[in-house]
């Protein structure tokens, strides 16, 4: 009984010592804050979500990919931030260095850096001109909508690489003629 009382006394003393200088009575979250969580930032840049079938499809694929990986990323200590940016002007296209619509970037890196395009009827109808939109190459096939698997793999590649967020180099960007034609026709 004496040893048990002494153990209880030591536990009480440890709690008191832990609480010195803390904002609470020794709760772990107060005295020992959680380590800083890492962040995965996903940018979805698009021209139109009302008529462009490629932008609408890319948005749906991105949402499905995020739904599939977000629980695992959270458990691994990552916060996922998704920025959906409607590029409505030349100025916004230049600011975000848009090469083609739609674009998905993970921590500043395009998920498909080799940009390929084909004529997009829906965007052509929007601006009254011939406009090309992005096509995605996955498993050797070109698709007008990025497959969920392509997006998930890009997110996981970024998580496992541990590389810092890629900064945009403003000096080398020039608004592509295709986007210029889109905004001039709008």
Task: Describe the predicted segments one by one.
Residues 87-93:
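Short, solvent-exposed loop/turn elements at beta->coil junctions and helix N-caps
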Residues 81-87:
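A short acidic/basic microdomain associated with nuclease active sites
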Residues 3-5:
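Ala/Thr-enriched low-complexity intrinsically disordered regions
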Residues 1, 10-81, 94-99, 106, ...:
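Non-globular targeting/processing and membrane-anchoring segments
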């Amino acid at each position: 009984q004496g040893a048990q009382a002494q153990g209880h006394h030591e536990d009480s003393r440890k709690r008191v010592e832990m609480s010195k200088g803390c904002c609470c009575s020794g709760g772990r979250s107060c005295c020992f804050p959680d380590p800083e969580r890492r962040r995965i930032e996903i940018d979805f840049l698009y021209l139109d979500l009302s008529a462009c079938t490629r932008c609408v499809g890319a948005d749906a694929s991105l949402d499905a990919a995020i739904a599939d990986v977000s629980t695992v990323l959270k458990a691994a200590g990552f916060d996922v931030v998704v920025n959906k940016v409607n590029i409505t002007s030349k100025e916004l296209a230049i600011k975000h260095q848009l090469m083609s619509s739609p674009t998905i970037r993970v921590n500043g890196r395009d998920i498909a850096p080799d940009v390929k395009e084909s004529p997009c009827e829906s965007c052509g109808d929007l601006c009254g001109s011939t406009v090309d939109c992005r096509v995605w190459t996955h498993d050797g096939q070109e698709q007008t909508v990025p497959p969920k698997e392509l997006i998930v793999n890009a997110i996981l590649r970024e998580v496992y690489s541990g590389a810092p967020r890629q900064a945009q180099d403003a000096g080398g960007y020039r608004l592509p003629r295709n986007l210029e034609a889109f905004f001039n026709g709008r």
